[in-house]
Amino acid sequence: ISRGITPKYNDESGKSVVINQKCIRDNKLNLELARRQDKEIPDLKLVQKGDVLINSTGAGTLGRVTQVHEDLPDTTVDTHVTIARPLQEISSAWFGAAISHIESYIETLGEGATNQLELKREVIGRIDLVCPAIDIQNQFQTIVEPMQQQILNLMKQNTHLLKLKETLLPRLMSGELDVSKLSSIE
C-alpha cells in the first residue's frame, strides 16, 4: 500500500503519466483526465496491472476505487490516490472485485474535518477481506478476466467513436463533407 508522488507537471512533453482523483469514478479509470510530468518515479509508485487505486482525500471523492486492467508503462498516481497492490498469493481479479464491493464502506473511513478528509494508508491496511481458497480465486479470475478485458476494449472503442463523431459532425453539418454520393449503409 503506497501513496502517490508530488508530481512536477509538464503536460506538453512530460515523460510519465500521473493519475489523479478525477480519473477514478464509477469503478472506471479515465486516463483522458490524467496529466503528464517529468519527475523520476520510484518503482514502488509505478502503477501495475492488477493494482487497485483508491481516492484518498476530500469529501465526495474519498473512497472511490478502480482497478488497473492493463499495463500502463511510466504511469503513477499523485498524492491524493493510494495504490493497493495484492499479495502474490492473491488473485488480482478477486482482490479488485472484493475492494470494489466495499467501496461504500471505504468512503466512511476518512478522518479529519469535512473538507479535509483523508484516508490514511494504515487505515486501508487494516481492512480485513475474507479470502476464498486459491483454487476458487483462480476460477474467479479465469471467468472474470476476459470480461474485464472486453469492458476495457469496448470503453476504448467508445472513446474512439466519440472523438470520430466530434471530428466528423461539424464537417458534415457545414457541408465540408459531402455524403450524398455514398451508397447507403445497411
Model-derived segments and spans:
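Sequence-specific dsDNA recognition surfaces
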Residues: I1-Y9, V17, Q21-V52, Q67
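Short secondary-structure boundary/capping segments
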Residues: Y9-N10, P73-D74, Q116
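A short beta-sheet element
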Residues: N20, P42-S104, G110-G112, K120
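Short acidic (Asp/Glu) and glycine-rich catalytic loops that position anionic groups and cofactors
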Residues: K28-L29, D74-D78, T142
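Short clusters of hydrophobic/aromatic residues that line enzyme substrate/ligand-binding pockets
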Residues: L29, Q37, V65-V68, I106, ...
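Short, contiguous acidic/charged loop-to-helix segments that flank catalytic cores in large enzymes
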Residues: Q37-E40, D71, P86, C131, ...
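Amphipathic alpha-helical coiled-coil/heptad-repeat segments
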Residues: E89-I90, A97-T108, G112-A113, E122-E186
